[in-house]
Amino acid sequence: LFSFKELNEQFKRKIKVVLPVDLVLIIAASFACYCTNMENTYGLEVVGHIPRGIPPPRAPPMNILSAVITEAFGVALVGYAASLALAQGSAKKFKYSVDDNQEFLAHGLSNVISSFLFCIPSAAAMGR
């Protein structure tokens, strides 16, 4: 992976389209697994059939709530704090105001609604 990324950097001027190396490696590894029957030969676990489309919305399983409540609270708190810090930083840089309550409501609703589609929690990401 590293050597391919270095090659992309060297040939960036000559080739206008950057090769998506990560995607190429995933496809090559999947093809190699399929062709060499690595599931049976080496005991590797293969995902199998992946259904198409978006799964229908359904309620998250409430029977595991007691097991994950503390971790979920921590993820929610850190995600909200990071998102709010970045929003306030952008507001200061571009001279606009941020309402903490509106951010809290938007962040909470987006994560609650996305839980019915079994999405991962959303939060802002701090760049370099």
Swiss-Prot record:
Pfam families named in the record: Sulfate_transp
Location of the protein in the cell: Basolateral cell membrane; Recycling endosome membrane; Apical cell membrane; Lateral cell membrane
Predominant cellular place of this UniProt entry's protein: membrane
Ranges in the topological domain labelled Cytoplasmic: 36-66, 125-128
One GO process term, biological-process aspect: iodide transport
GO molecular function (one): chloride:bicarbonate antiporter activity
Record topology, Extracellular segments: 1-14, 88-103
Tissue spec: Expressed in gastric epithelium, predominantly in the gastric parietal cells but also at lower levels in mucosal cells.
Reaction catalysed by this enzyme: chloride(in) = chloride(out); iodide(out) = iodide(in); bromide(in) = bromide(out); oxalate(in) = oxalate(out)
InterPro entries linked: SLC26A/SulP_dom, SLC26A/SulP_fam
Transmembrane portions of the chain: 15-35, 67-87, 104-124
Record-given protein name: Anion exchange transporter
Organism of this sequence: Oryctolagus cuniculus
Taxonomy of the source species: Eukaryota, Metazoa, Chordata, Craniata, Vertebrata
